[in-house]
């Protein structure tokens, strides 16, 4: 008999992150052939900035938990097979894993809020092309481990600066906030 998700993910926070990653793969945007047809390399691929053409800048951030942030160009859902998709940032137990993907990378992207306490990574996006940003997050309250999947799809505008922030909202829910930040650092 299947256990509830919080029981199925009990154990270490790392296990919660792995469970959250699996749940993301099983989300409504995926199918079984989609998940198992993808190579492991595709699931761990680092996002590569588009070269040439019009671009926008993106800062992906997460507050104080274990999380992964990924970009899926030309898709309204996470698609592992998209060859341009990849990891942007990661943290474990709220500690940034600098040198992993683009964690800690700064392009001078304007921020929607003070970066203190946030793990971030910055990349370029192709302008005028749909993109999905997806986070898988994990945390623990000492009794249970929780996994959460959140994402947003949008079409970036050339030369704009975007800031996506994933955070826990309560103990068992998370959300992604996406800001278009102007020259004065004000979120539109």
Go through the PLM ranges and name each one.
Residues 2-18:
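Bacterial N-terminal signal peptides that target proteins for export
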Residues 30-153, 163-188:
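Short loop/turn and low-complexity linker motifs enriched in small/turn-promoting residues
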Residues 25-28:
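C-terminal motif of bacterial Sec signal peptides marking the signal peptidase cleavage site
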Residues 18-20, 149:
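Generic hydrophobic-segment detector
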